[in-house]
């Protein structure tokens, strides 16, 4: 690996494009000065933003394209229109060709997933990717996957997610043996559908898993920090994510209304504002920004499309950590070490 971490950025992705991507990269660079950047997009817009960030400009290369994937494009449309020419595709292609170590985009999730699968292909034995993200809990942070990369999945898919999720938690949280749980409607072994019960059996039967399996976890256990890694298929994972985000916003609105409803409540807020500030920082979605696409033959990080520069910087940080800690190699080794088990294929005789 090069001494520098080379980061390819889709500078036209997301709701705000280069106006967020460039300052976000500049913030990340202050934390990781051994980074270099390839910025793909409208060169005039990118260079204008770079003028305010000379340190970033000095370690960046701008590659022009005026084709950007819309947040409203369907994946099939994005592939037809943006393949080979869009800022999103070119960032991914830089990873494929070895010019970058990781691609980061705040663009259309479905389009990014489709392009990543087409451009980078899947790891051997993995038939579909997953989105893994950091989830703040009362005990720290957890990794939750899949958060919507694909719908459904049999027991072998869930087992592969457990292996990849554990490798990700080991890298991000510096854990030797992370705990892993399967999201279910109850913790009892008889609960849930056939696939999830079969997945639990397959995981328990693994000879030398790189994690400690704790069984089933209910939805309220995610926020409680019941496990370092929570595994679920993409439909349930995406619903859980959106429900949690909505609940956080609802609580925030309730608190704001309560603290401004009367003179006494306003006075009380003055005494408690330090605690409320700490709570707001803990629940700040920007600090959990950066979903990792797992299962691909390359490292790809997805930022929230509507994030600000601070949030995008956290997504870049995630990509940096993935590369510096060699996540792709560790996932491959973990899948191989657990043999065809992790892929749901019978070992050779």
UniProtKB/Swiss-Prot annotation:
Enzyme class: transferase
UniProt-recorded Gene Ontology molecular function terms: phosphate:acyl-[acyl carrier protein] acyltransferase activity
Chemical reaction(s) catalysed: a fatty acyl-[ACP] + phosphate = an acyl phosphate + holo-[ACP]
Enzyme Commission number(s) of this protein: 2.3.1.274
Subcellular localization, as worded in the UniProt entry: Cytoplasm
Keywords: Cytoplasm, Lipid biosynthesis, Lipid metabolism, Phospholipid biosynthesis, Phospholipid metabolism, Transferase
DNA-binding found in the keyword field: no
Single GO BP term: phospholipid biosynthetic process
Domain of life of the native organism: Bacteria
Pfam family name, one: FA_synthesis
InterPro entries: FA_synthesis, Phospholipid_synth_PlsX-like
A Gene Ontology term for the protein's cellular component: cytoplasm
Pathway the protein acts in: Lipid metabolism; phospholipid metabolism
Family: Belongs to the PlsX family.
Subunit structure: Homodimer. Probably interacts with PlsY.
PANTHER family attached to this UniProt entry: FATTY ACID/PHOSPHOLIPID SYNTHESIS PROTEIN PLSX (PTHR30100), PHOSPHATE ACYLTRANSFERASE (PTHR30100:SF1)
Annotated function: Catalyzes the reversible formation of acyl-phosphate (acyl-PO(4)) from acyl-[acyl-carrier-protein] (acyl-ACP). This enzyme utilizes acyl-ACP as fatty acyl donor, but not acyl-CoA.
Name the UniProt record assigns to this protein: Phosphate acyltransferase
């Amino acid at each position: 690996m090069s001494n520098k971490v080379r980061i390819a950025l889709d500078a036209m992705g997301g709701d705000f494009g280069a106006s967020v991507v460039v300052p976000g990269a500049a913030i990340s660079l202050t934390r990781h000065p051994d980074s270099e950047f390839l910025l793909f997009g409208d060169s005039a817009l990118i260079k204008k933003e770079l003028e305010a960030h000379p340190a970033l400009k000095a370690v960046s290369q701008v590659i022009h394209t005026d084709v950007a994937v819309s947040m409203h494009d369907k994946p099939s449309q994005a592939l037809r229109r943006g393949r080979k020419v869009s800022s999103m595709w070119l960032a991914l292609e830089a990873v494929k060709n070895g010019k970058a170590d990781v691609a980061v985009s705040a663009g259309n999730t479905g389009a990014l997933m489709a392009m990543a699968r087409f451009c980078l292909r899947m790891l051997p034995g993995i038939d579909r990717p997953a989105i893994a993200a950091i989830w703040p809990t009362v005990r720290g942070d957890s990794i939750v996957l899949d958060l919507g990369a694909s719908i459904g999945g049999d027991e072998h898919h869930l087992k592969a997610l457990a292996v990849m999720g554990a490798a990700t938690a080991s890298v991000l949280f510096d854990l030797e043996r992370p705990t892993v749980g399967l999201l279910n409607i109850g913790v009892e072994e008889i609960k849930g559908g056939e696939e999830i019960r079969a997945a639990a059996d397959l995981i328990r039967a693994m000879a030398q898993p790189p994690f400690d399996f704790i069984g089933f976890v209910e939805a309220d256990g995610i926020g409680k920090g019941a496990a370092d890694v929570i595994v679920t298929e993409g439909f349930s994972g995406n619903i859980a994510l959106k429900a949690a985000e909505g609940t956080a916003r609802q609580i925030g609105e309730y608190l704001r209304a309560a603290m401004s409803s009367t003179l006494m409540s306003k006075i009380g807020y003055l005494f408690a504002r330090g605690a409320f500030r700490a709570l707001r920082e803990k629940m700040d979605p920007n600090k959990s920004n950066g979903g990792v696409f797992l299962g691909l033959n390359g490292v790809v990080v997805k930022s929230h499309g509507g994030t600000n520069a601070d949030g995008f910087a956290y997504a870049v940080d995630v990509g940096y950590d993935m590369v510096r800690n060699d996540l792709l190699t560790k996932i491959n080794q973990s899948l191989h070490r657990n043999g065809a088990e992790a892929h749901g294929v019978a070992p050779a005789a």
